[in-house]
C-alpha cells in the first residue's frame, strides 16, 4: 500500500507546472550543482593531502638513522659493514657508525635509541669473532657456540609500530642475513681451512655463523596498535563535535543563550565541556587498555594517558565551539572533515618518511598528542615533551580566549534571532487586524471558509488554459 500511495497524485501539493516554480527551477539547479561540486572538491583536496603524506614513502626509508657500534672489532663487525654497503640505498635505513669510545657499553647504545637520537641501533657483541673462530676448531667451543650472540638490533617498538616493523625491524633482520653471506665472502676461505670437519657443531657454526637478536624497547605486538595514530586520532575529534552540536541544540531549545547572562552561559558550557572531555578521555583510555593484550603498560601510564587525552579533547571542544559560533551551519561539515584529515595526516606516519612540506603538521595537536603518548607508553623514551606540551597548551590557551568571543557571538545571535522572531509575529498580528477591518460587515464565517478553500484549490491546480467550445 505504501508503494502504491507513492505513485498516486497528491491533491494537496503544488503541481510541477504551477507558477510557484517560476524563477525557482534555475536557482534550485544551480544550488544543487554547486553543492555537488563543492563536496567533490572537498573530498578530492582532503584525500589527496592524506594520500600525499605516504606518497613514495619507501624511497625515504634512508631518513631512518640507525646507530652502528662495533664492540667486536673483528671479522663479524666487518661482515656487518660489508652487508650494509651491499644494501645501502634510499629504501634502506642509514647506518651511522660511531666509535666504542662514544658508546662504551651496550646500555649506552640502548639509551641513545631511547632518547630518540636514532630510530634504531645495531651492535656487534664483544669477542664475537673470537668465539666463532674457536667454534670452528671444534670441541666445547663449537657445542656451546650461539650464533645469536653476535649481533643485536634495537628499536623503539612504540613509535609508529606499523612503520617501525615494516621498514626498520625487517631491514635490520635482512641485514643480519646478508652479513652471513658477507662473512663467507670475507673469511670463508680462512674459516674452511681452520674448520674441524669431523665436528658437526663446528660445521654448523660455519654454515650459520651469524644470527641477529631483537631487543625492542617496549614490545608492541597487539593488533590494535595500528589504530593508535589513525582511527584513534579521529575518535576524540568526533566525540567533541557531537557534544558541541548537542549542547548547542539544548541551549537553543531551553532559551539559555537569549535569556541567561553571558557569564552564566559561559560557566555552564565550560563546566559541561570539562566534564564531558574528562569522561570521554576516560572512555578512550579504557577501551585502549581493554584490548592491550600482553602490552606491558602500567597503572601510572593509564593515568597519564587519561590526562593528556583530556587536554586533547578539550582543545577540540574549543575548536568546534568557535566554528559553530561564527560559521553558518551548512558549511560546518567542510571544516569538520578538513580538521579531521589534517590531524590524522600529521600523526599517521613519521615525518622522516614524508615530504618536507608536511612537516608543518608539527603545529597540529594530534601530532603532539601522539608524541606525548609515545613517551608515556615507552617508559619515557622518545621524549619530545619539551616541544609537544607547549604546543598543546598553546592550543588550549588560544581556545580559552576564543571561547569568550564565541560565547559573546552566540548570545548576541540568539538575542537577535529572538527579536526578529518577535517582530515577525507582531507584523503578522497587525496585518491580520487590518484584514479583519477591511472585510465586508455581513460576510459570514462559512462564506469566508468557502472562499479560502476555493482559492487554495485553484493555487494547487495545474496552470493550464482551457479552450472554449
Language-model region placement:
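Short, functional N-terminal and low-complexity linear motifs
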Residues: 13-19, 32-33, 45-51, 252-256, ...
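Extracytoplasmic/periplasmic domains immediately adjacent to an N-terminal transmembrane anchor
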Residues: 2-223, 420-469
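Membrane-spanning alpha-helical segments of multipass transporters and channels
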Residues: 222-243, 247, 254-440
